Amino acid sequence: MNKVKLFVDCHVFDGNYQGTTTYLKGIYSELIKFKNIHFYFASYNTDALSKIFGYQDNITYIKYSTKNKFLRLLFEIPKLISKNKIQYAHFQYVVPPLKKCKYILTIHDVLFLDFPEYFPLTY
């Protein structure tokens, strides 16, 4: 049986806990139960990820070489997706400009769209 290969950009786990980390922890704690999907969880601090999701045959942890978001999005992630023959990738807020597979983009907070008067133009 061929497994679906799903890359998850987990860089948000490298910072302070927030709504995005709660969302990812919740959804992927359930999805990793599906053994027909192989998950590639990527972050700079993979030790933190392994404490959350544990070790299973269908999980691979990938350590980013940098915390720099520009280098990660422009170079590192596209290279990792190609190297691991990823079919789908899940990102938060921003996707790499060079898309090497189908992708899922989650935008968690869109208050700036409903109430632009409360946010600076640069937001």
Give the ranges of each region predicted by the language model.
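Carbohydrate transferase catalytic cores enriched for Leloir-type hexosyltransferases
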Residues: 1-123
